[in-house]
Amino acid sequence: MFVGEIMPMGFGVHYVGSEGVAINPFYDILWMIIFVVIIAVIIYILISPLKKQSSSIDNEKLIKIEKDVEEIKEIVKELKKKWEEIE
């Protein structure tokens, strides 16, 4: 037997091709927008901890810089005193 004898030619192909196709192109755009929003939220969730870590690192750097500035001020005061003694 040939396939053409069992069912008309193209019937199966047409049925498979039409299955799951959206009726209105608006729904395709809507699903695409939803998909993009979901991807954006996932990326934001993955990146947000990295931003928090970098801000804490920045705070640590600022604290270290402030300590260094205080040390430099003390050194400058000592050098001024020594310079006055020399004069």
Curated annotation (Swiss-Prot):
Keywords: Membrane, Transmembrane, Transmembrane helix. Its main location: membrane. One of its GO terms (cellular component) is membrane. It is found in: Membrane. It is a single-pass membrane protein. The chain crosses the membrane at residues 29-49. This is Uncharacterized protein MJ0230. It comes from Methanocaldococcus jannaschii (strain ATCC 43067 / DSM 2661 / JAL-1 / JCM 10045 / NBRC 100440).
